[in-house]
């Protein structure tokens, strides 16, 4: 649920407001989100609520699949996006789980001001500490994409052999089930690189890589949508969205249509707060050079 006030930067920047709304919302949560809700309701506040000592799902995909909006309201302002990720992402994730959201937010932000997918993938990665497992995994995706530019399956197999292990999520440790942020981020990047700007191919590859295979194509296609714009989305994909745009999400007063308005309002606020301008229907932004986020404290097992 959004707080009752009209959407503004103040709401995002007021951590206590976000924490309270997150913990007390009526809708169900799972994994890192649910553990964080439990923690907050029992007095363990962010960032401790997302820390691996208190949250066994700290490396899960939760923040990674929620960070899209952060990049979308920060056009070209990759470091501003990272600052928002720090406030929001540490509610439920930490370490590699947090880096996943930072990275996706960075790619969305850069997608406004870059048309080249490789540039977006590599520039966004500059926000992530090189010592992290997450960084190493995405570097491997880029490496094997270059080695096998025409066969995503060979790249997938290399990544599977090196990075498809689950060491955190209790439901996934002894099963094939894996919602680790790192491996699923790799599948998003594979979809983008091998999809080469084609919406169907991007979603198809990100889906067929497996694991969290509804979220990954959604993330990859979302980034592609920012690069190319709404008009470039093939008509085939639009009717299903249009039919549900005005349906309210369960336990909220928010529909997809209202989300569009909320995000545009937030984008306008972020733009003005960072030296950008709005003249009529034209938006002028400030382009930031990516800065590396400080390294979260990692588990000993993350050094493997």
Where are these regions (language model features)?
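Acidic catalytic motifs of isoprenoid enzymes
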Residues: 1-61
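Structural helix-adjacent loops and short alpha-helical linkers that scaffold large soluble proteins
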Residues: 2-10, 77-78, 113-119, 195-201, ...
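Short, mixed-charge aromatic SLiMs
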Residues: 13-28, 88-99, 124-137, 208-218, ...
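Stable alpha-helical elements in mature extracytoplasmic
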Residues: 14, 64, 81, 100, ...
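Accessory "access/gating" subregions that flank catalytic or transport cores
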Residues: 36-58, 67-78, 86-91, 106-210
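Short sequence/structural elements of tandem HEAT/ARM alpha-solenoid repeats
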Residues: 79-83, 119, 235-239
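Catalytic phosphate/nucleotide-handling subdomain of diverse soluble enzymes
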Residues: 92-96, 103-105, 109, 187-270
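Acidic, carboxylate-rich catalytic segments that either coordinate divalent cations
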Residues: 135-177, 227-304
């Amino acid at each position: 649920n959004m707080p009752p006030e009209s959407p503004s930067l103040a709401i995002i920047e007021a951590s206590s407001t976000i924490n309270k709304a997150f913990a007390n919302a009526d809708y169900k949560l799972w994994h890192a989100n649910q553990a964080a809700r439990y923690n907050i309701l029992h007095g363990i506040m962010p960032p401790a609520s997302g820390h691996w000592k208190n949250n066994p799902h700290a490396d899960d995909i939760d923040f990674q699949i929620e960070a899209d909006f952060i990049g979308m309201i920060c056009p070209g302002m990759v470091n501003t996006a990272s600052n928002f990720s720090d406030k929001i992402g540490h509610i439920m994730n930490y370490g590699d789980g947090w880096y996943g959201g930072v990275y996706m937010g960075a790619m969305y932000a850069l997608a406004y001001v870059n048309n080249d997918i490789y540039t977006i993938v590599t520039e966004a990665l500059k926000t992530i500490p090189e010592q992290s497992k997450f960084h190493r995994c995405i570097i491997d995706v880029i490496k094997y994409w270059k080695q096998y530019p025409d066969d995503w399956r060979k790249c997938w197999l290399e990544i599977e052999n090196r990075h498809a292990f689950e060491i955190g999520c209790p439901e996934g440790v002894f099963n094939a089930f894996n919602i680790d942020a790192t491996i699923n981020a790799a599948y998003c990047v594979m979809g983008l690189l091998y999809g080469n700007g084609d919406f169907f191919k991007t979603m198809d590859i990100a889906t067929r890589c497996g694991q969290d295979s509804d979220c990954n194509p959604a993330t990859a296609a979302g980034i592609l949508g920012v690069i190319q714009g709404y008009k470039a989305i093939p008509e085939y994909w639009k009717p299903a969205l249009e039919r549900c745009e005005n349906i309210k999400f369960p336990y909220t007063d928010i529909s997809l249509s209202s989300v569009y308005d909320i995000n545009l309002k937030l984008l306008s606020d972020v733009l003005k707060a960072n030296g950008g301008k709005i003249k009529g229907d034209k938006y002028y932004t400030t382009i930031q050079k990516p800065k590396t986020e400080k390294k979260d404290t990692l588990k000993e097992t993350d050094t493997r």
